[in-house]
Amino acid sequence: MFQDGLLKGKRILVTGGGTGLGAAMGQRFLELGADLVICGRRAEVLEETAARFRSATGGTVTAVPCDVRDAAAVEAMMDRIWQAGPLDALVNNAAGNFIAETHRLSPRAIDAILNTVLHGSAYCTVAAGRRWIEAGRRNCCVLSILTLSALKGAAFRVPSAMAKAGVLAMTRSLAVEWGPKGIRTVAIAPGPFPTAGASQRLTPGGDDSAVEREIPLRRNGAHIELANLASFLLSDMAGYINGECVAIDGGKQFLSDAGSRTLELMNWTDEDWARMRAQATGKR
């Protein structure tokens, strides 16, 4: 699909890059010639992923454990990364989400999502942007992975919708503020792209068929499809795209109603919600 070496010469950091969509994007970046840095909270997972990537692609991969919720830890991570050379791109991918009745959420539950998605994305973006601006480095890019809820809201997933909408506002604001400095900020809003963790937290009973019925194309997205879109947006081919959020959702965003999933959740009983809470926390 892409020319060989599309991302050659670019050094890219993917937060939450050890698993799921972050890992899928990271491997594709390597295949297209980039040098990759992945970060996450679990050092063992990062190292296993990095070793697998090196074996599969022969590319350069650096694993840096970091909790993006901690601003000081993010600064330390960026210092460590820059010791080996500057980044050219940042992918804000670290995320968290769960289904819950909003009136039952504790402050801790709300903070768990906002701190990872909103604060973590902001900390990483500001830390990278400051270093680029101070060095006069141009042709850099921040790509943030959102969800459709950033565009439309999401009942029963309010903290995630709030956080992702905030990251979208950051993306559009910095497109104007940082554009003259040669820094692009863009975003992707994926529809359903099943991963092991998200499927357990967000799909009752682990059945994706109901979700697929809400998608006009009648299927979930494949990880390679998202990875290819991300690769394009980070490449020089997309050099005039700035402040844009691209949805990749099989047409789901254009459904005229709230979707049968939301309507189903509105009719759940207390027992249904109890089962979902147990599933989300790993209890049986």
Kindly give the residue locations of the regions a language model identified.
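Active-site helix of classical SDR
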Residues: 125, 163, 171
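The beta1-alpha1 cofactor-binding region of Rossmann-like NAD(H)/NADP(H)-dependent oxidoreductases
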Residues: 65-76, 107, 224
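Active-site loop-to-helix junction immediately N-terminal to the catalytic Tyr of the SDR YXXXK motif
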Residues: 105, 153-161, 173, 197-198
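Conserved glycine-rich cofactor-binding loop
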Residues: 11, 16-20
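C-terminal substrate-recognition "lid" of short-chain dehydrogenase/reductases
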Residues: 219-248, 253-254
